[in-house]
């Protein structure tokens, strides 16, 4: 249970950070004129799997 709670908190923090980074990158690419149609949202499934495997709670 603790693992799940930690995962949720980490996931929320990562999502916020990822959105911020993606937004910055997209802004930069738009300014550069090299916008390569980035996905609007990061691949949550991959992130979740990554966190899960690193926390060791499969």
Curated annotation (Swiss-Prot):
Main location: plastid
Top-rank taxon, per record: Eukaryota
Record flagged with keyword Chloroplast: yes
Subcellular location: Plastid, Chloroplast
GO cellular component terms listed in the entry, alphabetical order: chloroplast
Keywords from the UniProt entry: Chloroplast, Plastid
Protein's name in the database: Uncharacterized 6.2 kDa protein in psaC-petL intergenic region
Organism: Chlamydomonas reinhardtii
């Amino acid at each position: 249970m603790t693992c799940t709670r930690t995962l949720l908190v980490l996931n929320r923090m990562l999502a916020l950070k990822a959105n911020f980074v993606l937004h910055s990158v997209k802004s930069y690419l738009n300014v550069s004129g090299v916008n390569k149609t980035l996905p609007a949202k990061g691949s949550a499934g991959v992130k979740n799997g990554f966190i899960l495997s690193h926390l060791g709670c499969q």
